[in-house]
């Protein structure tokens, strides 16, 4: 086991605070509408420009191990906030730095660290209640657009695009962000259920120009197993011909005689038909097939439930308004399933999302939920250079998370004002059990001003003057609009934050800050003195002695 170095008390805390300050000072230059960019060096490729706090925090690794411990603990604040709320990472870092800085001073002055921590926790609980009191639900898509624009660094185009995407796919819908090939940032919306399986044979194509299959008012046969024998589906084919409706077959596979017969019937024009493989794999495939059955009002032909393919009747087939199949994917539009059944299925998937501990499973369940409940929207982010595209994609991701958070828990006035208003409502009469706890409450009281101070100073204003002006005016929504330099009603001018983001930034900051204030010893591995690499001898070059005559 390697030898360790141990630091105690004030010496340990000073090193830790140093690391906190280095990381927080690099992150906080990005805060607010007039925050600056940070350039991140990469071991390969071009440097990356970002205004995303968590991206900056993740890049910082300090040489001194004790300072690095402090930096990494604050990095944890921003990455935890990013994981839960998706935005507010810079605010969380600024709050953590302020609480740690004031807390360390109090410990150095002889306060009891445990009482300080209790005071901090009391204050944070009270402020969270205060935030709930001033938050309100998102009223319309304009407010969604405003939240998105603020998070994307006052980029109105991004805010509008996210609001439009949410409008089209619903609040449960999946919105993904991808890098585009061109200059334009675009929004593609897939309404209905789409899965990534295309037609089994190009002979099924009905639109030869676009190489796709289009079916209006089709019947849909859903089969869990492979179909290889024609006799199994003959009865269904005859029923489809008699009803003069196209037939869509979704099965594990269709092969041999069955596939050949379907193709021949399609080419002769007697039967409009198309076959695709079932989406997904293993257990997930069965679940997705059941989703499709619920959406279309059909029955999944599965031996598990005692339904054999030979015994399928026409009323077991699903229906939809239309289906479009390309080489790569299939889209079912406006399935004819019962709304109550779809709702029950959606609630069942929601319950599974709550229960699962795997991020991968959660993501796949979210996709299934979106396909049933709304649709899928893709924002393709464009730009002139790769560096610009990556920077813009960071901002769009932030904006997307922020708008989701706003829909979940409502909105509060932005620009660092919500924390001050919640402070007025909840900390004015809050009393700790003793003097040291009261100091902990006062530390939080002071720290809640910090985001507004930094936003103001990044915009070229004097932080203390701005804070005093905002605190003097008791109107909840009144604050400093750093983008325009005007004091005004922030909600009316569209400067709003999701309550969830502000709440989580404060809770994560206080959680880590409380732990760091109560630290009394730090242990790190001693750096190893690696001997220098021995120089190689000039073996084999001895014969070059005669080169002396070249002088």
From Swiss-Prot:
Keywords: ATP-binding, Chaperone, Cytoplasm, Isomerase, Nucleotide-binding. ATP binds at residues 30-33, 51, 87-91, 415, 481-483, 497. The keyword ATP-binding applies. It is an enzyme of class 5 (isomerase). It comes from the Bacteria. The keyword Chaperone applies. One of its GO terms (molecular function) is unfolded protein binding. Its EC number is 5.6.1.7. PROSITE patterns: CHAPERONINS_CPN60. It catalyses: ATP + H2O + a folded polypeptide = ADP + phosphate + an unfolded polypeptide. One of its GO terms (biological process) is protein refolding. NCBIfam families: GroEL (TIGR02348), PRK00013.1 (NF000592), PRK12849.1 (NF009487), PRK12850.1 (NF009488), PRK12851.1 (NF009489). Belongs to the chaperonin (HSP60) family. HAMAP family: CH60 (MF_00600). Forms a cylinder of 14 subunits composed of two heptameric rings stacked back-to-back. Interacts with the co-chaperonin GroES. This is Chaperonin GroEL. It comes from Magnetococcus marinus (strain ATCC BAA-1437 / JCM 17883 / MC-1). The gene is groEL.
């Amino acid at each position: 086991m390697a030898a360790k170095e141990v630091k105690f008390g004030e010496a340990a805390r000073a090193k830790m605070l140093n690391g906190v300050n280095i990381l927080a000072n690099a992150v906080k230059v990005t805060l607010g509408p007039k925050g600056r960019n940070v350039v991140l060096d990469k071991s390969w490729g071009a440097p990356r420009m970002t205004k995303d706090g968590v991206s900056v925090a993740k890049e910082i690794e300090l040489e001194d191990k004790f300072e690095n411990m402090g930096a990494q603990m604050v990095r944890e604040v921003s990455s935890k906030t990013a994981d839960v709320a998706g935005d507010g990472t810079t605010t969380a870092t600024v709050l953590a730095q302020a609480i740690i800085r004031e807390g360390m001073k109090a410990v150095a002055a002889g306060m009891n660290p445990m009482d300080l921590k209790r005071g901090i926790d009391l204050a944070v609980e009270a402020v969270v209640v205060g935030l709930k009191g001033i938050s309100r639900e998102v009223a319309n898509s304009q407010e969604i657009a405003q939240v998105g624009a603020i998070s994307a660094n006052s980029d109105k185009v991004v805010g509008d695009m996210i609001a439009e995407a949410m409008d089209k796919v619903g609040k449960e819908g999946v919105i993904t962000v991808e890098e585009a090939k061109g200059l334009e940032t675009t929004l593609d919306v897939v309404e209905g259920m789409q899965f990534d399986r295309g037609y089994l044979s190009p002979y099924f194509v009905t639109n030869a120009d676009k190489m796709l299959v289009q079916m209006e008012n089709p019947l849909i046969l859903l089969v869990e197993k492979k179909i290889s024998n024609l006799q199994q589906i003959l009865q269904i084919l005859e029923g489809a011909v008699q009803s003069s409706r196209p037939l869509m077959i979704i099965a594990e596979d269709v092969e041999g005689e069955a596939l050949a017969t379907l193709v021949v019937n399609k080419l002769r024009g007697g039967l409009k038909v198309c076959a695709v493989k079932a989406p997904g794999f293993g257990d997930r495939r069965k679940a997705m097939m059941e989703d499709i059955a619920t959406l279309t009002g059909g029955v999944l032909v599965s031996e598990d439930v005692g339904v054999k393919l030979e015994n399928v009747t026409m009323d077991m087939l699903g229906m939809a308004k239309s289906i479009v199949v390309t080489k790569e994917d299939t889209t079912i539009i406006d399935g004819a399933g019962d709304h109550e059944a779809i709702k029950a299925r959606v609630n069942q998937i929601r319950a599974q999302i709550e229960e699962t501990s795997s991020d991968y499973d959660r993501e796949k369940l979210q996709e299934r939920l979106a396909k049933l409940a709304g649709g899928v929207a893709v924002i393709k982010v464009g730009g002139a250079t790769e560096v610009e595209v990556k920077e813009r994609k960071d901002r769009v991701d932030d904006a997307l998370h922020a708008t989701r958070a706003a829909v979940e828990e409502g909105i509060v006035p932005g620009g660092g004002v919500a924390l001050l208003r919640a402070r007025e409502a909840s900390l004015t009469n809050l009393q700790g059990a003793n003097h040291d706890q009261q100091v902990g409450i006062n530390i939080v009281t002071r720290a809640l001003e910090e985001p507004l101070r930094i936003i103001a100073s990044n915009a070229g204003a004097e932080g203390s003057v701005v804070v005093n002006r905002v605190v003097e005016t008791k109107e909840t929504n009144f604050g400093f609009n750093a983008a325009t330099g005007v004091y005004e009603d922030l909600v009316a001018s569209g400067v709003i934050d999701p309550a969830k983001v502000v709440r989580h930034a404060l809770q994560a900051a206080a959680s880590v800050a409380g732990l760091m204030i109560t630290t009394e010893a730090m242990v790190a591995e001693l750096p190893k003195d690696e001997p220098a690499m021995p120089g190689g001898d000039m073996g084999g070059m001895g014969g070059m002695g005669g080169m002396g005559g070249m002088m």
